[in-house]
Amino acid sequence: MSHLVSSSLGTTTTATPTSRSPHTNHSTPYNQNSITSNRSSPVPKNSVNSRIIPQTMNPPIDMKSNNILNPEKDTDTSRGDHSESKASSISSASGTTTTNNNNVSNNNSTGKTQIVFIHKLYDMLHDESISHLIWWSPSLDSFYVTPGEEFSRVLSQYFKHTNIASFIRQLNMYGFHKVNEPFLNQDDQQQQQQLQSNRWEFRHSTNQFRKGDTESLKNIKRRSSKTLNAQKEVVNIKSLPPTSHPMEYNTGYSYQNEDSAHYFVHHHSITTMQSPADMRPRSPSTPIPMQPLAQQQQQQQQQQQQQQQQLPSQPVPNGPPVFSGPIPPGAVNQSPQEYLTRPSILNNVQGSFENATNFKFVELTNQINLLRNDFFTMNNRYEILQNELKYQTADSMAVLEILEKLSNDNRIATDIRDLKNVVSQRMQRLNNQFIPQQSNFAPHIPGQQQQQQHGNSVSSNYHLESTNVSRNPSTTNLNVAPQPYPLNPHYTIYANNRASGSSEINNGVFRAREDSNNSKRNLSVYDPLQPVPSRNSSRILIEESTPTHPPTNFNPQQSQSQSQVQLGPAMPPQGFRNRAESTYSPLSHSSNKSQILNKAPTPVNHSPLVQQQQKEAKQELNDSSVAPPSQSSLPVTRPLSRQQQQQQQTLHHPSTTSSRTNSLPNPVAEHPAPQSSYFMQRNSFNTVYEHQKSLRVPSPKRVRYATPPRSIPEQPISSTAPTTMITSTSKPTSTSGAAISRSENHSVVSLTGGALPSVSELDKSIRTGSSVSLPPIKSIKDNDNKNDNGNSDDNGNDHKKRKLE
C-alpha cells in the first residue's frame, strides 16, 4: 500500500489515501485510518499548506450540499474508489515506475491528494491480456469498452467489484462521457448501432486523457456534486448484454443496445426531465456467482468492512443538464471559457435541443393535421351553403318574374272584384236571415219577465185573494190608494158600508175568498207585511158575508122558553165581526156533534174503542131527538160567562172557523170538518201539541173550549138582568142566527137551541149597558162531569192533555 507523506512543522504522519476528492469549498479531508478514542484531540496546522490533519474521523459538512443535516447522503463514493490503493500496489508489482511515482503525491504546491482511478484506467488500457475488452480508439483520445460478464471479472481484479454501472459512474465523475454522433441521420445511426451494439466509446471532456500523455493525467480531478449534477451522463444498465446468471446482476438497469444507451446518456427524455429521481443509479453488493463459496464469503466480509470504513456515498440524481447557472470556479481547475468550449457540453446541448424540438414538431404536426381536417369540413359546409343560396336566388328571381306578369295582367283585377262581390252578397244574405230570427226571439223576453214578475207578485201577495188567478200583474196596484195599512182585502178604510161580496169590496183587485178548501192557502203564523195589532185597542170591524147555514131542527118550545137579550141601538150589521176576536181569539177546537158524527172515518179511529164510542153517541142523539126534554133536566138559568158566550157563538156560527180570510191562519179544530182535507194544517195553536193530538182518541160527548180573548174587558154582570134558559140536554145539530128584537131601552136576544150570543153582541151590550142572561156555568160543568164519569176509561190520560190545552 502506498503512503502519502505530508510535512507539517517537522512532523511526519502516515495515512492511507482517502477515496474522496477534496471539496470545492476547501474543506479539509480527513484521515480514514487515524480513528482513535480521543475524538476531540487537537491537530496542528501546517503553515505552508494551511492543511489540518486531524486524528479523528467526522464527516465533513458541505455548505453547498442540499442536505446539511444528513451529509452522509450527499457524498458519493464507490467500492472501486476504495480499492484504488490495492490497485496501485498491483501496478507497482508489474514493474511500471510511472504508477509508483504517481501514487506518491507531492502536495507541496497543490495541497491535494493524487487520484488513483485515472491511473488504474490507464493501466487497464495498456494491459494486453484484456485488450479485447478495453482498448484505445484510432484517434488515441478515447477508448472502447465492451461490457459483459468477462469485463465484470476484470473489474474485480482492479477495483474489487464487478458492477459495470459503478465503473461507468466513476468515469462520469472524472469527466468522461460517451461519444455520440449528432450529425448522422437516423438511418446511419441505426447502422452504426447495429455494428457497435456491444461497444461503448468514452472520451474525456477536456482531452486530458490521451495515450502516451501521462503528465496530463494530473489535471484530471474528481468533480463535486454540483458539477456532476450539471454534467453527469447516465447509462441505463438494462442495455447491458445478458450474462449467464442475469438474476445475480439484475439491479434495475440493463443495456439493450447502444442506441438505447445513447438515448439515455445524451438525449434526456421528457419523462426523465420531469422525474429525475426515477433514474438514480444504485450500487449493489452482489458477489460473482462463478467464484467458489469460500471466496464469496471472504469477499462479502471484505465488502462489509469496506462499507463501514469508506465514506458514505452521495447519490447522483439523473436530471437534465443545467446550463443556466454559473459554474463554480473552484470546482474544476479550468477557466469558464475552456468549460464552454468542451465538446461534450456542446453535444449534450445540441442533443437535448434536438430532442425537445422534435417533440415540439410532433405536437405541432398533430395540431396542424387537426386544423386541416377542420378546415376541410368547413370548406364542405361552405360549398353546401353556397349551393343552397344559389338555388334560393334562382327561385326568388322566378317568383319576381311571375309577379311582374300578374301585375301587368288586368284579368286578375276583374277576378278579384268578382270574388269580393260574391263574398259581400253572401254576407248580406246571412245578415237578412239573422234579423228576423232576432225579431222572433224578442217577444219571448218580456213574457219571461212577466212570468218572473208574476211569480214575485204571487210570492209576495200569497195571502191576498182574487177571483182571477191568471190576472195581469201590471193592473193589480192601479186602484189602490196610498194608505198606512198593509194590503189586506178585509180592512175597510172607507166610510160607507158596501154590500157584502169580495167583487164589490175589492173592485176586482184582489182574488175572492176560497171558503171551501183551506189547504190551498199558504198558511203562516203572522203576516210579514202586517204589524202586530194591539190587543186592547184593536176594534177594527171586518166585513164578511152572511154565512149560509143548513136548516136547523130545534124544539120550538125550547126556543120560546129561552130568554131574550136586548141589544143596544148602535149594533153593527150582522155582516161585520170584531177584528180582535178574529185575530187573537183561539176558536173552539171542537165542532158540533153533527159534524163529529157525519165526518168521514180516518185512520186514527180504527180502534174498537173508538167505534164503540161512536155508536153510543149515535144512540144518544137519536134518543134526544125523539124524546121530549123533561122539566127536571132543565138546569137553573144563570148568566153566562164570557167564555161560555164565545163557546155558544162558536156553536151558532160554525162557518167562522172555516171562513176566516185574514193574514193569520185559522186554528185547526180537534175534529176536522168532513169537507176539509184529512191532513191537519200546522199553525201556532197546534204545533206544540201535534204529537199528542195524533195519538188522542176523540170523544163525541166531550166539548172543550179554549181560553177567552183578552181584548174584551171583563164587566160585572148584574143580577137583575133577565136570564136565558139553556138546557144542557138540548144538542142541536146546527145553529141558526139569534132572533134579535130591538126596543127603546134595550135589545133582547133569544138564543135558540142552547146557543150563546156572539162576542160582538156581548160587547155591544156591555157598551150600551144592557144585560144579557146566560145559562149557568155549573150546569155545563155538571154535564161535563157526567160525561167524564161515563167515560172513565180514558180520564187519566185525557186529564193531562186538557190541562195543556
UniProtKB/Swiss-Prot annotation:
Keyword entries, A-Z: DNA-binding, Nucleus, Repressor, Transcription, Transcription regulation, Virulence
Region feature Disordered, mapped onto this chain: 1-110, 273-336, 438-483, 513-675, 691-746, 759-805
Subcellular localization(s) per the UniProt record: Nucleus
Molecular function via GO: DNA-binding transcription factor activity; RNA polymerase II-specific DNA-binding transcription factor binding; sequence-specific DNA binding
Gene3D superfamilies per the UniProt record, alphabetical: Winged helix-like DNA-binding domain superfamily/Winged helix DNA-binding domain
GO cellular component: nuclear chromosome; nucleus
DNA-binding among keywords: yes
DNA-binding region: 117-226
Bias type Polar residues, positions: 25-69, 454-480, 533-556, 581-597, 604-614, 622-635, 716-738
SUPFAM superfamilies xrefs: Winged helix' DNA-binding domain
Extent of Low complexity compositional bias: 1-24, 86-110, 295-310, 557-566, 637-659
Family matches, as InterPro entries: HSF_DNA-bd, WH-like_DNA-bd_sf, WH_DNA-bd_sf
Observed phenotype of the null mutant: Enhances flocculation, filamentous growth, and hypha-specific gene expression in several media and at several growth temperatures.
Basic and acidic residues: bias regions: 71-85
Role of this protein: Transcription factor that plays a role of repressor of filamentous growth and flocculation. Antagonizes functions of SFL2 and FLO8. Plays a role in the hyphal repression induced by secreted factors like dodecanol by competitors such as Pseudomonas aeruginosa and Burkholderia cenocepacia.
Family: Belongs to the HSF family.
UniProt protein name: Transcription factor SFL1
Protein encoded by which gene: SFL1
